Amino acid sequence: SWMNPMSSPENAASGNRSVEQPAAGRPAAIAAELVSGGSLEMGAHRPQDARDIAALLPAGTPVYVNHLPRHRLLDTLPTLVAVREAGLEPVPHIAARRIKDRAELQTFLSRAVGDAGVRKALILGGDEAEAIGAYADGAALIREGLLASSGLREIGLPGYPEGHPRIQRAVL
């Protein structure tokens, strides 16, 4: 049995307040407790999973939607919309080397902000050896200026504390 250390007579006498007992035996409540203040990542090709995921998470939880190789950035839009409609916060991965051109990026940002209510994006280089368009890395995407004028309120950047196999340490 679980005992709350804050509910001991000594703590009660000293004015310490007790804490709530964990949600034992309720998977949805346990999952919500574990991710409180956290985030989750889901595949962009599974918009139908958004409602099931939302049933396990607190409303407004950030859900990062990946941008996989061989897929267009616009292919992530149905999942971003489904995440927003499920009451969660959609956060797209934007992989610079996978973007064909400025028009593709501009169309995506306009629709992501307008249709899915995207406020934040994670800017990545992408693991391709060669860029398919003008953006060699996340920094080039940021310098381009469309992110700043898109309506996004925040961007996230990856960190590689142990290094990255395709990025020289000096660049990191």
Describe each region flagged by the PLM.
Residues S7-S8, G15:
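Intrinsically disordered, low-complexity segments enriched in small polar residues
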Residues A12-A13, A23:
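Ala/Thr-enriched low-complexity intrinsically disordered regions
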